[in-house]
Amino acid sequence: MVKGVAMTSLAFDTPYRGGFSGREHHFALTVYFEDTDTAGIVYYANYLKYMERARSDMLRAVGIDQRAALDAGEGVYAVAEVAIRYLNSARLNDDLIVVSSLETIRAASVIIHQRVMRRTDILTDARVTAAFLTLDGRPKRQPTEWVDRFRAINEQGI
């Protein structure tokens, strides 16, 4: 027990990960001091980091193991394009949710719509194109099983 705070084994054994609500993946995070500038406002590039974490968590949630694909030489996702609008600022200690949804699924890429939100306020609105590449950087068809999982999410959610 930390002074005045009861801790369960769950707090140490199972890190929180995001999850799906229908077709949307929700990833929770808190703004820490390292994320902010001297005014306590989140530095603009950190929103891209938040969205990257959410995309990685979304892939894990549907059973896609990026590390295993990399180790096996199958390929990797790399961001090919980002279109982002900054609408409002997050501040130190804010609790945020990154909401991600699959917008377009192509043979060698996927477009993901991502919003960073504080409660009901949209702070950023982005569309991220992630290309699937060989280990030497050439476009490659995504594994069929992965495409099928993405399509199932778009059709029926999780």
What are these regions (language model features)?
Residues K3-G19, R23-F27, Y86, R91-N93, ...:
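HotDog/MaoC-like acyl-thioester-processing domains
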Residues G4-I64:
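Catalytic strand-loop segment that frames the active site of acyl-thioester-processing enzymes
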Residues V42, Y77-V79, L123:
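A broad, structural micro-motif
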Residues G63, A68-G73:
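Short beta-edge strand/loop motif at the mouth of beta-sheet-based domains
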Residues D71-S101:
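Helix-adjacent hinge/juxtasegments
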